[in-house]
Structure formats: C-alpha cells, structure tokens
Amino acid sequence: MGFLTFLIVPLLILGISGIVYIYREVVRLMSRSALKNKVVVITDAISGLGKECSRVFHSAGARLVLCGKTWEKLEALHDALISVADPSVTFTPKLVLLDISDINNMEAMGKEIQDCYGCVDVLINNASMKMKGPLQSVSLELDKKIMDANYFGPITLVKAILPHMISRRTGQIVLVNTIQGKIGVPFRAAYAASKHAIQGFFDCLRAEVEEFDVSVSTVSPTFIRSYHVQPQPGNWEASIWKFFFRKLSYGAHPVEVAEEVLSTVSRKKQEVFMANPIPRAAVYIRTFLPELFFAVVATGVKEKHFVEEEK
C-alpha cells in the first residue's frame, strides 16, 4: 500500500498540474480571441507597463490607440510593434500625443482619440506620476502636480470618453492603480492621496454606469518594478518595510501586470489585487484592526529614522 501511494501521489500531482496548465492556456487563448477588433486606448503607452500592454493587446488583434507625451517614443513603440506582428491578424496602431496632466486640453484629446476609429471599446488608464519624500518637504505646487497627473487628468479623460460608451451601451474603463489606493505608505503622502482619490472615483463610477452596460475595472499591484532598477541591499528600499508591500522581491514585472490587465479586460473583472498574502492582509487589517495597522506603520517609520541616524 505504501509503495502504491508512493507511485500514485506524484502521478496525481503531475496530472493536476497538467490540467491546471491546460485550463490556463485555454483561458489565455480565449482572452486574446475576445479582444480581436476591439478599439483599445492605452495612456502612457511609452512606459514600461504601457509598452507591455501595447504588446499583448496588439498581438491579440486589438485596434490600438497609443497615447504618450513624447512623439519620438510613440513612433519607436509603433515601429517595434509592427516589426514583429503578423499584418494579417493585427492592426497598425494609431498614435495620439497626450499629456495626461494637461487637464485644459483633455476634452480636445478625448475627441481626437474618438476620431481614430469612431469609438472606444476599452480605455486603459495607465499614466501615473510617482513621488516619495517626507510630506513636510513636498511643496503644495508638487502636490497639485501629482493630483493633476494621477487624478484630475485621468478622470477628465474618462469623462470625455464615457458619454460615447453610454450612448453605445457598451465599453470598459480600466484603471491600473496600486495597493496604495487602499492603504497609505509613509513618505508617499501625495502619491497615496492621489491613488486613494482615483480609487474612490472608480468605485463610484462602477456603480453609476452599470445600468448602461459599461464595465469598470481596477488592477492594483503592490508596485510595478522597472526593467533595470533594483534596490541595493541594506538601504531603506530593501528593508523589511519594503517586504511588507511587495509582490515579488522587486515588485510585479510589467509583463506580469500586462497579462493580468489583458485577462481583466477579457473577463470583465471588477477588481484585482496583485499581491502576496502579506500586503493582502494589510488591506484587511487596515479596515478591521486599524490600531494594529497604524502601530506597524509607525514602527516602520521609526526603523527608518534609526537606520539614518546610525549612518
């Protein structure tokens, strides 16, 4: 009996693994087929995540409108996409020069985006401005700049695109946010505030447009790592406090997040957290045991000051 168990258990594990793999591949292929011919707008397409989103949606057969504030980088992305794509199953992306923080020009930009294909099926809000530092050292001017880039700009674009989705009774609006839209991290006050604001806006938006068959989704990783930058051992960025909010050792890779965005769009998921159990637990602890959460946060801040004083 023991020998049979020794043989059966590995085979059972292997069989289950095979079934899971096949299921994931089927879901992935269905996700891509569901996006063929869809008009997908990606803001800040020239960022690391923007490029990966452009790649996966382009290969899925979507009609892309790529937005960014540097024309040369948009053209380079355009050339990179068409150089590796099969022209018989993909569409040539259209480009729109867009600075998401330029609120006064957003209505005109929304019209230009609409005019690319006559409609928008999916709007992916990917643009974001990051900042860290003690809150008392951040000027009000910089606070406003961050709010323009992370909140006022994106919602102004949403308001420009939304009426057309409502009139067609179809569409999906996606926000690539961060877990800092749910919990605040010290020394990122302005950034966390902007992310809380945009999260609240999307939560309200979801309820208000459901009757018009417009879907609203948020994808929130702990943070998205760059391709090249990694924290140096021993510094504050690599400390136990960073571990508390990470997805992987150095955050979620743009490729991983882009695939999740693709899955979220095709399956119309409402909210996705890309996080390991520790930051997931932090969100719930903040809600149900706030005193404990605040104590842990304060301990992390004290640890930082202690390390700096020792240096």
UniProtKB/Swiss-Prot annotation:
Write the Enzyme Commission number(s) for this entry: 1.1.-.-
CDD domains annotated for this entry? Answer: 11beta-HSD1_like_SDR_c
Main location, first listed in the record? secreted
Regarding protein family, the annotation reads: Belongs to the short-chain dehydrogenases/reductases (SDR) family.
Query: Do you know which InterPro entries this protein is assigned to?
Result: NAD(P)-bd_dom_sf, SDR_fam, SDR_family_member_7C
Fetch the SUPFAM superfamilies from UniProt.
NAD(P)-binding Rossmann-fold domains
> Which positions are annotated as binding substrate?
T178
Its gene name is: dhrs7c
Protein name, as recorded = Dehydrogenase/reductase SDR family member 7C
Q: Which GO terms describe its molecular function?
A: oxidoreductase activity
Q: Which residues form the signal peptide?
A: 1-18
Active site residues according to the UniProt entry = Y191 (proton acceptor)
User: Record's Gene Ontology CC terms?
Assistant: extracellular region
**What are the record keywords, sorted?**
NAD, NADP, Oxidoreductase, Secreted, Signal
Q: What does this protein do?
A: Putative oxidoreductase.
Give the location in the cell. Answer: Secreted
The record lists NAD(+) as bound by: 41-65
